[in-house]
Amino acid sequence: MQKLRNIAIIAHVDHGKTTLVDKMIMQSHVLRDNAKNSGELILDNNDLERERGITILSKNVSVIYKDCKINIIDTPGHADFGGEVERVRNMCDGVLLLVDAFEGTMPQTRFVLQKALSLGKKPIVVINKVDKPNCRPEVVNEQVFDLMFSLGATEEQLDYKTIYGSAKQGWMSHVWNQPTDSISPLLDTILDEIPEPAVVEGTPQMLIPSLEYSSYIGRIAVGKVTRGELKTGQNVTLAKRDGVTMQKSRIKELMVFEGLGKKKVDAVPCGEICALIGIDGFEIGDTICDYENPEPLPPIAIDEPTMSMLFTINNSPFFGKDGKYVTSRHIKERLDRELEKNLALRVEPGANADSFIVFGRGVLHLSVLIETMRREGYELQVGQPKVIVKEIDGKKCEPIEEMTVDCPQEYSGTVIELATKRKGTLTNMETNGDRTRLEFSIPSRGIIGLRSNMLTATAGEASMTHRLKGFEPWTGEIEMRVNGSSISGETGTAYAYSIDKLQDRGRFFISPMEQVYEGQVIGEHTRQNDITVNVTKAKQLTNMRASGSDEKTSIAPPKVFSLEEALEYIKEDEYVEVTPHAMRLRKILLNETDRKRASK
């Protein structure tokens, strides 16, 4: 039987997990040589992942090294996709903790490491990016040790091996200033340090922590066989999460991961990660077990969502111009499909038949879903993100996050002021060279819309990360966006002539010759109140000319929002209208008279 190792790679966002896996794939010659220089990451194969440079979904690949098969699971680093990270832990026998040699340990590192240590996994620490100038590998290694100690690691876990290297340049070494020519030292350490999966004899058992979706076959269950072995055509029982419901089923096909793809097999031994086809109606957390006497495994606990958002059909005057799928039935079917594979998501029906309340782990988590739907041809409108409030011991409680901000020293005062305005409290402050790291405890409500203000205030130099700490008593009202909106009073084409005349009233979000409709938010007013303006007036052409009266108009460029910025910007009485080709802000009530009546 082939030797086997199962490892997961965990790290903070952008510390180089996916790049490292790509190098492992190349070292084991899975790809043809000419595919190696494409410059893009092999694993981030979803357009959104490539554009944003982040991993959203966990992936499985395997490499063969010295006759041993290594199954590698690449996981996302963002806490918003924590649902993806948590469920994958059950499939691995050890973890590679990847840390940036310059940035050191970050909040997300702590979040993912805590999960792995609590399951008793032994880590191998990889200090990556040692080719960066001003990096401090030894200091970072001590930081990791302190972090593991503070998270209550056992003595065995603290006796970890450290490897230094640069995934981008493709080398790893036991000493940081002695580069080698390959990543073999890392692969050797994996073989020596990570235990082989335990082989347990008996009736088959497999927990389903992950799934894949194929438009040909439907849903495919992915997991690790923890006891016995599975065979093609075998009759099994599907034990549901509740531990009571049992469904009889049969395995049609079995596959194992080989390189970047999958390979059909007749039997899967204990300890191997495999994909099952032919099991109907399974959910994540269910167990596949013996046909005669089923013994389910305990299901996985997943963190609760912290934020909700209203999704509704597009009913603006420009409805149906761009999108293929515009009705509530389409949106409902798409959300139901997403629920099948997106663990941390929940959907409830809204106040009327056309709206749905979608719960998720944060603005990024929900905006990735909206962006994916938009690219598939859906039109929809989304409301302002709201945090989920719980009642604990008769007290109103809200989600509180730990936020870390790295910024140049001269901006630290501005950053502290921004955070404390939003009910944040400073818990720690470290200065390293000319950069300062500030740690805050801040309500989730306060983080909505904070990132764009933070970047503006620090000239784009600050980097901000946060993770959920728990629920704490309500901190009181937070002053959010101060300025009112400029709203179009007419439907038609926006003209440069009108925009120029109104520039002193505030910034615009539209360009000349764009189509606008009544009730669309087309700019930000300089004052606190909303203002209705008409940008559809063109210049009246007469025969009279006065010299010098026809100067060229100079119009400031419009402010363009990304989807997250738009969601964080809108007020309670506004929607973001999302279509495949456009994104507009609008008032929920388009007519000015209706808005006045509602505000009384």
Predicted regions and their residues:
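Residue-level signature of catalytic and energy-coupling elements of molecular machines
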Residues: 14, 20, 53, 72-74, ...
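Canonical P-loop GTPase G-domain recognition
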Residues: 122, 132-192
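Conserved nucleotide-binding/hydrolysis modules and their immediate coupling elements
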Residues: 205-309, 319-321, 483, 492-542, ...
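Alpha-helical scaffold elements adjacent to nucleotide-binding pockets in ATP/GTP-utilizing enzyme cores
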Residues: 23-24, 62, 84-87, 91, ...
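Interdomain boundary/hinge elements
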Residues: 37-40, 125, 151-163, 197-207, ...
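Conserved structured catalytic cores and adjacent interaction surfaces
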Residues: 2-19, 92, 102-114, 120-122, ...
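A short, contiguous, amphipathic alpha-helix enriched in charged residues
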Residues: 316-339, 556
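P-loop NTPase switch module centered on the Walker A-proximal segment
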Residues: 1-99, 103, 143, 211-214
